[in-house]
Amino acid sequence: MKKFGKKVVLVGDGSVGSSYAFAMVTQGIADEFVIIDIAKDKVEADVKDLNHGALYSSSPVTVKAGEYEDCKDADLVVITAGAPQKPGETRLQLVEKNTKIMKSIVTSVMDSGFDGFFLIAANPVDILTRYVKEVTGLPAERVIGSGTVLDSARFRYLISKELGVTSSSVHASIIGEHGDSELAVWSQANVGGISVYDTLKEETGSDAKANEIYINTRDAAYDIIQAKGSTYYGIALALLRISKALLNNENSILTVSSQLNGQYGFNDVYLGLPTLINQNGAVKIYETPLNDNELQLLEKSVKTLEDTYDSIKHLV
């Protein structure tokens, strides 16, 4: 691979993509930011809008409209393009139509001579990230999904509101599928080293509050989609966080969608787990200790993803 730099190409200039572009320009994380979308007039307008305000970015950044050949020397290609999730529709129900869209995009990116990292956000993200890895033949550490990074942020936010602390003081994760089979790792969730689950149970006299927090985390996207059509600010900031960890060689641990290689006894499947992210990609999955119930829920999540992936294997 070439020397790691800071050129990012975004494929997909819808609500998620444009929100991510704005966040990236605001933070000045990339030196060059390229946007690709079939809606070329929209891209041109967004490029102008972003460049007009780039003076006030934290560091210089050039934004431009591009084509797939721009991926040739990109360090990171972020794919947000895909059919949106409709009210009442699960992420897994999007699978076949978005797999076909993804195949077209990834083929065009690879035809450019691309030799960088993929960051996938289109849903169902765990399935599509695995699909991109299989189609491209790239090493697993260079094909990363947004996973449960946003879910974990939602989880930490809801806990923080309940306990009256900042989100950054809450150490807790959502793992598994970015979707209905995701699970909360209550056995490890803590604030100041004290169990969140036990604290909630002591304060309320039951586990109802913990269950409510989990359900509100899991179903957050459905509520937002019902009210305003789609989610985009939260996932855009999650993508920003992952991009920053990659581009700035942070050695940060984030619950991205990574490919399992023996962890918890599973192989090949992609799902959200605490993963070390640096300039070499998703370099290490941390096998968080889980209790028996959590292990059963993880197995269920893996089975859900495996069954769904089997349904689109013919498209590889």
Curated annotation (Swiss-Prot):
Listed pathway(s): Fermentation; pyruvate fermentation to lactate; (S)-lactate from pyruvate: step 1/1
Record entry for activity regulation: Allosterically activated by fructose 1,6-bisphosphate (FBP).
Catalytic activity: (S)-lactate + NAD(+) = pyruvate + NADH + H(+)
Binding positions for NAD(+) per the UniProt entry: V16, D37, K42, Y68, G82, A83, S104, A121, A122, N123, S146
A Pfam family it matches: Ldh_1_N
GO cellular component terms given for this protein: cytoplasm
Stated name of the protein: L-lactate dehydrogenase
GO BP annotation list: glycolytic process; lactate metabolic process
Alphabetized UniProt keyword annotations: Allosteric enzyme, Cytoplasm, NAD, Oxidoreductase, Phosphoprotein
Function: Catalyzes the conversion of lactate to pyruvate.
Record EC number: 1.1.1.27
